[in-house]
């Protein structure tokens, strides 16, 4: 996997260390994120790494090289999330190399950015499902309102653990990707509404490990930021006043504004 496995790993230790210890997604901290990534990428370039060679197009070409190497006439593609973008690009570049393509959790062009409006819509979709479940309603008549109330009344610390809203919302955002994790995070909010913030305090701290163990962040800054639009104010999308949750994961794109190198975009047709 180009940029992750093999001889070159696009590791970004300065970014990880800074991100793990951020308390708020303020403009000052977001700018520091961009500076940290810039420093990490500069070190990679000083080691002889050509960062322009680590785009999704190169990834797709690697797959085609492997197909040829194995002598397959056609191959089947099974892709989820980010992988669906690779599958999509592969289908455009090498349509005759594909036998079948199965995709789930589709990530179309532009899909690396989670807008606050879409996240709000998805949270309310969870809320609608909740209201149709008598067992769930017995715990809370409105899980969305529960989340909103809890986020508005968070203590600064709980039993010695700092409870930081921006970090908590970020890890909540990550956990809402899957229904099993969503159920767990809802349980934590339900407990907090009853005065037990231990689960949310743990999640606020656990984001450290989530960031540290997430696949190589430099890979994101050479592939994922292809959806970055310099005309968009990503900082304003993190905590928009009209929505209670916002888009905490947008902090990554907000930091891209402060990179000291141009973003390598892929051809427009992809």
Summary of predicted features, one role per range:
Residues 1-166, 222, 228-270:
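Gly/Pro-rich cap/lid or specificity-loop segments adjacent to the active site
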Residues 130-224:
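Alpha/beta-hydrolase-fold enzymes
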């Amino acid at each position: 996997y180009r940029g992750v496995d093999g001889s070159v790993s696009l590791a970004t230790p300065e970014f990880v260390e800074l991100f793990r210890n951020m308390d708020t997604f303020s403009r000052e901290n977001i700018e520091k994120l961009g500076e940290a990534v810039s420093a990490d990428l500069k070190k990679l370039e000083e080691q002889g790494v050509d960062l322009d060679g680590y785009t999704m197009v190169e990834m797709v070409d690697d797959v085609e090289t492997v197909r040829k190497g194995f002598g397959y006439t056609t191959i089947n593609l099974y892709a989820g999330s980010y992988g669906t973008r690779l599958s999509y690009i592969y289908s455009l570049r090498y349509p005759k190399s594909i036998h079948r393509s199965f995709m789930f959790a589709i990530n179309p062009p532009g899909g690396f950015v989670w807008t606050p409006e879409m996240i709000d819509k998805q949270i309310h979709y969870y809320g609608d499902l909740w209201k149709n479940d008598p067992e769930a309603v017995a715990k809370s008549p409105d899980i969305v309102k529960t989340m909103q109330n809890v986020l508005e009344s968070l203590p600064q610390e709980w039993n010695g653990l700092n409870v930081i809203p921006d970090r908590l919302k970020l890890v909540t955002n990550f956990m809402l990707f899957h229904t099993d994790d969503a159920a767990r995070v809802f349980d934590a909010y339900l407990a907090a509404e009853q005065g037990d913030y231990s689960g949310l305090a743990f999640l606020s701290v656990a984001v450290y490990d989530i960031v540290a163990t997430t696949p190589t962040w430099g890979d994101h800054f050479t592939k994922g930021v292809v959806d970055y639009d310099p005309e968009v104010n990503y900082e304003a999308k993190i905590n928009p006043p009209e929505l209670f949750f916002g888009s905490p994961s947008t902090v990554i794109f907000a930091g891209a504004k402060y990179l000291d190198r141009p973003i390598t975009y892929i051809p427009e047709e992809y």
